[in-house]
Amino acid sequence: MDGVPEISQPEVKKGESFTYDFVVRDAGLYWYHPHVMSAAQVGFGLYGALLVEDPADGVNVADQVTLVLSDIGFDAKGKLEPADSGGSAGMVFGREGDYVLVNGRRRPVLRARPGAPQRWRIVNAAKSRFFYLDLDGQPFTVIGADGGIQEQSETTDIVLVTPGERVDVIVAPKGKAGAPLTLRAMLYNRGYGSVEYRSVEDVMTIEFTNETPIAAKPISITRELPAPSIDGATPVDVILTLPPMKDNKSEFQVNGVPFWKAKPFAAKLGEKQLWIVKNDSDWDHPFHLHGFFFHVIDEKGQPVRPLALKDTVNVPMKTTVRLLVDFDERPGQWMFHCHILDHADGGLMGTVMVGDGTPKEHTHKQP
């Protein structure tokens, strides 16, 4: 169940339908979107969330909400912004929409009892925008990531959610009726232009009820995750680059070639691999692997904790991140790519062939 044309299944053409019949096994927060002209179709709003709950996750919070964050752009005539606006330069920057949305709405209002804990499951479904979230300085308790509850909860004043990522947080907004809070997307430097030509965005308003405030106790959530060991793991270099423009076109590359010229990586069924993802470009890249979770071992040589099951992780510019992947099952050909979808369409994609099958040919061309 993957849905990548020419790789895992045929595209679903206009007027056609396709039924997925599958067993739900892994709790976590997921989302779905097309893999045909991804940047365009996701930018136009074709996406949704899929929540797989674990009744035994230990999170006893009554108020729960799923927040799908995104953005959308329009041209001067009020029509959806063309997918190729800005040409090759727009692809390199990663096009962001003009209007930030939450569950398809602009600046919605969420009602809260003062001090009452709420569980926010957050999906970043934007094609390029990073959400660097601040709630008027009030704390977030991060309890989980893409693949469910993480090893240990942690408290922070700001949360970064990059495209494709999911984060599970507890908030206990403090305030009073008539004095709302604002959830904002702060400026985050993901590459040239992402700070210079952008502004802080209001995302959502928290309005308080007149109920008596609650003095909630701090919430601590844990999950036993086996300590990852890189012993015996096969090292795999994944080098992300953006060479100088040629013939007025830019292309991102993995290990020196764009997707339309690349050969698949290979993994034996049951093999453990250590992917050494080196970002040699001047842009951050949210790195996403289809079909498998991974553990983020370290970033710039520094261990990453708490442990969490991830399928998307930001690889900052000029930084190396090591990922431990266990290709334990699910043979077949699987995609990996930057989840800034303009970057993916611009060549920053690849596939890994798991098992002994024959890789499929594709007709993806340089845009």
What residue spans do the PLM features occupy?
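Histidine-centered copper-binding motifs that mark active-site loops
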Residues: M1-I170, G191, D202-E224, P228-K246, ...
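Residue-level "contact hotspot" at macromolecular interaction interfaces
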Residues: E11, R111, L160, K174, ...
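Short tyrosine-centred short linear motifs in exposed loops/low-complexity segments
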Residues: E16, V24-Y30, G115-A116, E165, ...
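Hard-cation-handling environments
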Residues: A185-M186, V236
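Short beta-strands and strand-coil junctions in structured, solvent-facing domains, enriched
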Residues: A40, S128-F130, A177, N189-G193, ...
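Asparagine-centered strand-capping/turn motif at beta-strand->loop junctions
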Residues: I122-A126, P173, V277-S281
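Active-site pocket scaffolds in enzymes
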Residues: M1-E6, V142-T156, D237-P367
